[in-house]
Structures are given as structure tokens and as C-alpha cells.
């Protein structure tokens, strides 16, 4: 799977739920599946449960994890195209994404709605930029309009 933005991306939901039940029954059954693989989790917004559960799930699969809090401890990133870079943002997201992709095997993105431009929010621009420019599989840890991990958990 190259992209997981919506539970519909899973295909057969019954099969996905069945696999999830199997994994939940034996959390370490696939503990070598992610060996020598790295998950990069990019947070444009704060998180508690999603961050902890996603990181733990990756660890249960034997993956390494890198957490990048874009607004704390990293350069602020400009996400708008065509903006003059004269503000407090030191790097453009389009330049940073390929760099991020070079350090990992899969990327999780958490980027909330800006609530100033409905069309922009619904376009899921940040998420789709990662899809287009990272060269890696990408999944949403919550976006402007969806939270597929939570939606999948709610199906239980």
C-alpha cells in the first residue's frame, strides 16, 4: 500500500479487521517484519494517543522510529507554494520532504485543518505533498478531514 488516507484504502475491511484481531491477540507475532526499517512520524500538530500507539505499533513490528515535531525542535516549514520566504519559516516543505524520505522507509503525517480556507483544508495539500515528493509510502495520523487510524480502531 502506497498511501493510507482513508479506511477505504484498506480494500477488504473484513480481511483487515481479521488481521488486526490476529495481531492484537499476539502483538509480537510479527516482531521482525519491520527489521532494518524506519518509520518517520511527522507532527505538524500535537498528539498523545496517536503518537504513542503508532510508535508502539512500529516497535512491536521491530521498526525503528523517528519523531519530528515540526513546530518544536525543528525549523518551521512553509507549506504554501509561491510564498516569499521572509517570515519565521526557514525552509519550504517541498525541499524538506525528499530529505525526510531519504531517512526512512515509511512516513506518518499529522496535520490538522488550518480553518481559514475550507478548500485548502479539504484538498489535504500537506499530506498529498508527502505522497508526491517523499518517494515512500505515506499514511495519515490525522489530517484536516480524516483520522484513518482512529476510524479503523472504531470499527472494532
Model regions: which residues?
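Positively charged, low-complexity intrinsically disordered leader regions
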Residues: 1-52, 56
Amino acid at each position: 500500500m502506497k498511501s493510507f488516507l482513508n479506511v477505504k484504502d484498506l480494500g477488504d475491511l473484513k480481511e483487515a479487521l481479521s488481521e488486526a484481531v490476529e495481531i492484537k491477540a499476539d502483538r509480537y507475532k510479527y516482531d521482525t517484519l519491520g527489521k532494518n526499517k524506519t518509520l518517520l512520524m511527522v507532527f505538524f500538530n500535537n498528539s498523545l494517543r496517536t503518537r504513542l500507539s503508532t510508535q508502539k505499533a512500529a516497535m512491536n513490528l521491530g521498526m525503528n522510529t523517528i519523531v519530528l515535531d515540526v513546530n518544536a525542535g525543528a525549523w518551521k516549514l512553509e507549506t504554501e507554494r509561491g510564498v516569499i520566504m521572509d517570515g519565521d519559516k526557514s525552509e519550504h516543505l517541498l525541499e524538506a520532504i525528499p530529505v525526510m524520505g531519504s531517512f526512512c522507509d515509511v512516513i506518518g503525517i499529522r496535520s490538522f485543518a488550518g480553518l481559514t480556507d475550507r478548500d485548502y483544508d479539504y484538498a489535504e495539500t500537506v499530506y498529498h505533498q508527502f505522497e508526491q515528493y517523499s518517494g515512500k509510502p505515506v499514511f495519515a495520523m490525522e489530517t484536516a478531514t480524516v483520522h484513518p487510524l482512529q476510524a479503523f480502531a472504531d470499527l472494532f
